[in-house]
């Protein structure tokens, strides 16, 4: 990661990994990443993801000059300027479009049926092809690539991520996004800035002839195939 001259405020790229990094492609993306001058890399290692993110947010709060946090794990690929692009959207909470890395390879946006108490991933073909998508009242999402402003971190802490105990949520990031919604924050998905999610291959949402496909990218960034949705 390197700093670049920018009128945008500095922040922290919060890299959350185990003691051994899973995918080299993710480290290549981090190495190429750019952020406004004054930004820092806040790298936290360990098996407890919730604690690592809490530590990363605490690092942001300890440095008044840092005005945002960008959450990233070691199983994603992304463009070098993704944090800058998300900052330019001027939203309090925003994530890039990201797909599930196992079937169905739909966005990591969760639709909740309050009547039947059921959940499903939102189908990719139902998503717009550009601009920002605002989560609906019965939707949640993952936190991969989330850019969250300092003011939101201040209001939602100091204990940001809860370790799962009751089983009422599927994962800690789901619980955290639900907390943000309850505090009155809107959450946006940037359809023009997207993540790859590394599984058997790197699964990426791509537009082909104006329609969404799931692009499968192998080692060396070699395109394997496009899956229609």
PLM regions: where:
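Conserved catalytic core of nucleotide-sugar-dependent glycosyltransferases
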Residues: 79-164
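C-terminal catalytic/acceptor-binding lobe
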Residues: 3-8, 155-229
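Short, conserved alpha-helix that lines the donor NDP-sugar binding/gating region
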Residues: 49-62, 177-178
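Anion (oxyanion) recognition and catalysis
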Residues: 34-35, 87, 181
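Short beta-strand-to-loop acidic/aromatic patch adjacent to the donor-nucleotide binding site
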Residues: 64-77
